A protein has these predicted regions:
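Short Asp/Glu-rich motifs
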Residues: 52-53, 181, 203, 398
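Acidic, His- and aromatic-enriched active-site or binding-groove loops in soluble protein domains
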Residues: 60-76, 188-212
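Hydrophobic mid-domain F-helix/FG-region of cytochrome P450s
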Residues: 157-164, 178-186
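Short, surface-exposed recognition loops or helix-turn segments adjacent to catalytic cores
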Residues: 169-178, 197, 280-286
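Short, conserved phosphate-binding/catalytic loop or strand-edge motifs used
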Residues: 132-138, 174-182
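TRNA-binding/sensing appendages of the translation machinery
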Residues: 1-92, 96, 152-156, 173
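Positively charged, Gly/Ser-enriched RNA/tRNA-binding surfaces
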Residues: 18-36, 47-48, 82-85, 93-107, ...
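Short low-complexity, flexible loop/linker segments enriched in glycine and/or proline
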Residues: 55-59, 186-188, 295, 402-404
Length: 418
């Protein structure tokens, strides 16, 4: 039987040209985030199935790659349901593993803990542009910091990185889960229906206010509640004035500190930012994960046509491991989507230095080859990237191929002439 050469559906092979950009971006991520005090950590890509199915991951829990029990623990004939056959799965994000990691190692970590976590995650999703079943995710999280300083630092660190990658005119959309709930409560929606309301609200970009109105009506909600709810969205602006409007409008159902903190985050980021972007209050921003408890944010880029990153505060998640809540806030960038955008725009890694190719005639005597190897080693010590290859018959094609890899200078060595 002939083996299959193509990767499994939803996976991809990464060629050297893309790998060079990926390596550069990862290096820049580490360099930039460490300037903000984040430190690297790692957790296994395999997690307990109980942790992955704890109703914290939203729709991602439907996309888990489950791992069968092994050996004596695997009793297929006695299994009554799927979970009787599995005890672990591949992580679908980095947040659940981070919370388990922190819960297990908190006594050995600084407080607050500023974590940088880069690694592959896995989702049995439908592949599409910029979306794969295995993909790299890059998260920064601040654990143990209850104030809005965490949100400010996360937004500034992430936007500084994007600025270094020559991204401009993007938008950080920001909202707060408490504002979402207060708006729904003020409008008269029953608390048990909030999630349904938010799922419909999340479609605002695609179906508009009228579409949201129609879907809410189809769900059987009162017309008065729908009109009150959507009337606020017509009045709210995307700046600090919009936050102040919400603070006044919802004063009977919303702690004023929620709006005041959000205003401080927006004003602080605007005053300090170094990258070219705007931060915009967006009361329609929902974010799919149920574990968010406070401010939430998302990166919107017109050239991608959607989100390329996001995050928020999740103060109640670590408590599910320890029994005691710990303040936590994180921001994840869409690493694969950002690399895809860089490739599409023909991005070149800066400062790669000179790349030189030594082409050696076939059957070069050992003593002469040694001389060439010493010469190459000397150039490498001086900072030049040197590759050594045997000269092919079609030398022109060989050079053209190497030029696509960035080699700009070629040195030819022959047996009778060095």
């Amino acid at each position: 039987m002939q083996l299959k050469k193509k990767p499994v559906t939803g996976m991809k092979d990464i060629l050297p040209q893309e790998m060079e950009i990926r390596d550069y971006v990862i290096g820049l991520i580490k360099e930039t985030y460490k300037q903000f005090g984040f430190t690297s950590m790692e957790a296994p890509c395999v997690e307990h199935i109980e942790n992955l199915t704890s109703k914290q991951g939203g729709d991602n829990e439907k996309l888990i790659f489950r791992i069968l029990k092994r050996g004596e623990k695997l009793k297929i004939s006695e299994a009554k349901e799927e979970n009787d056959l599995v005890d672990s799965g591949l992580r679908y994000d980095l947040t659940v593993p981070l919370c388990r990691f922190y819960s297990n190692n908190a006594n050995e970590l600084p407080q607050p803990f500023k974590a940088l976590h880069i690694g592959n995650v896995f989702r049995a999703d439908r592949p599409q542009r910029g979306r794969f079943r295995q993909f790299m995710q890059c998260d920064i999280d601040i654990l143990g910091e209850p104030t809005y300083l965490a949100e400010i630092e996360l937004v500034l660190a992430t936007t500084t990185l994007l600025g270094k990658l020559d991204f401009h005119n993007f938008t950080i959309r920001i909202n707060d889960r408490k504002i979402l709930k207060a708006m729904a409560q003020y409008s008269g929606f029953p608390a048990e229906s909030f999630d349904t309301v938010f799922i419909i609200l999340d479609k605002m970009d695609k179906i508009g206010l009228e579409g949201v109105s129609e879907e809410l009506e189809k769900e059987g909600f009162a017309r008065e509640s729908i009109d009150t709810y959507l009337g606020m969205f017509r009045e709210i602006t995307s700046d600090i004035q919009g936050v102040r409007y919400i603070k006044e409008k919802l004063k009977d159902v919303l702690d004023p500190k929620v709006a005041e903190d959000l205003e401080t985050i927006i004003a602080s980021v605007d005053a300090v930012k170094s990258a070219d972007f705007k931060i915009s209050f967006d009361p329609t921003l929902v974010r799919g994960m149920s574990y968010y408890t406070g401010p939430i944010f998302e990166i919107a880029m017109d050239e991608f046509g959607g989100s390329v990153g996001g995050g928020g505060r999740y103060d109640e998640m670590i408590g599910k491991f320890t029994g005691q809540n710990t303040s936590a806030c994180g921001f994840s960038i869409g690493f694969e989507r950002i690399v895809m955008l860089l490739l599409e725009r023909g991005y070149e890694v800066p400062g790669t230095g000179e790349k030189k190719a030594y082409l050696i005639e076939k059957n070069m005597p050992a003593d002469k080859l040694l001389t060439i190897l010493k010469q190459a080693e000397e150039e490498r010590r001086n900072g030049t990237q040197v590759t050594i290859s045997i000269m092919k018959k079609n030398k022109k094609f060989q050079k053209e191929q190497m030029m696509t890899e960035g080699y700009t200078e070629f040195v030819e060595f022959f047996r009778d002439k060095l």
